[in-house]
Amino acid sequence: MASLIDIKQRITSTRKTSQITKAMQMVSAAKLGRAESNARSYEPYVSKIKDVVTHVASTGNSNDHPMLVSRPVHRTGYIVLTSDTGLAGSYNSSVIKEVFQEINKKHTSSDEYAIITVGRSARDFFKARQMNVVLEVQGITDHPIFAEIKDIASNTVQMFEDGVYDEVFIYYNHHINSISSELRKEQLLPLTEFHEKGKEADVDLTTYEFEPSEQEILEVLLPQYVESLIFGALLDAKAAEHAARMTAMRSATDNASDLISDLSLQYNRARQAAITQEITEIVGGAAALE
């Protein structure tokens, strides 16, 4: 059995750790509230620009834009959203595992894919395995602004337009609530949903006159729309990250409390045993003197 001093030291260190995890839980809870607000406030913008793109692309005169039409796939781009730090449960590992398995199943050569990482966790994982990471960004703040990922977003769109990629997917954790999230895989490019809508004969849309032409409008709108999807996914993922870290720290705090209770019980038992032993020795010594 451990000595009283050892048990007391473990109780002290566990209590200090519990105070740290409790503080981290409270910080994550505060960050989560703001992250949820950011994600919600951005949704109307994405929805509106999607409506505009739908109207323009569904006119029948411009739905053959290169960003709308599927083409033979020779190279796939993967955007992977993770965090720079850990202590967030399975937040990072679930996304990384899904992308890793998808690449191994779908591709036989590094020439067939390219990985774009947001967050140090994904970058370190894929680079450690000599996988093809072509773009990366770290240091995303807890409450991101578009400027932080503008280069990656615009480069992704440009490389698709230049034929470097034939399709682009984004992987991230979608925030549901404070205790749950789900892994999402979404196709960013090509935007085939708009191309298919343009082919539908029963599309009921208000008639608009476009100035300049639909094609010129799409040249500006489509890249902006894809970039908005990437930023929207980042805001969503950040909310999921803070929720995951809050949950992980709450679990750590609860586990620390349970451990302190167990150690306190051990301490009391050891102390009781020591006292009993001392009494026994005193009684035995007194009896020997009689």
Curated annotation (Swiss-Prot):
InterPro entries: ATP_synth_F1_ATPase_gsu (IPR035968), ATP_synth_F1_gsu (IPR000131), ATP_synth_F1_gsu_CS (IPR023632). F-type ATPases have 2 components, CF(1) - the catalytic core - and CF(0) - the membrane proton channel. CF(1) has five subunits: alpha(3), beta(3), gamma(1), delta(1), epsilon(1). CF(0) has three main subunits: a, b and c. Its main location: membrane. Belongs to the ATPase gamma chain family. The lineage of its organism: Bacteria, Bacillati, Bacillota, Bacilli, Bacillales. The keyword Repeat does not apply. It holds the Pfam family ATP-synt. PROSITE patterns: ATPASE_GAMMA. It is found in: Cell membrane. Produces ATP from ADP in the presence of a proton gradient across the membrane. The gamma chain is believed to be important in regulating ATPase activity and the flow of protons through the CF(0) complex. It is a peripheral membrane protein. One of its GO terms (cellular component) is proton-transporting ATP synthase complex. Transmembrane segments: none annotated. This is ATP synthase gamma chain. Keywords: ATP synthesis, Cell membrane, CF(1), Hydrogen ion transport, Ion transport, Membrane, Transport. GO terms for molecular function: ATP binding; proton-transporting ATP synthase activity, rotational mechanism. GO terms for biological process: proton motive force-driven plasma membrane ATP synthesis.
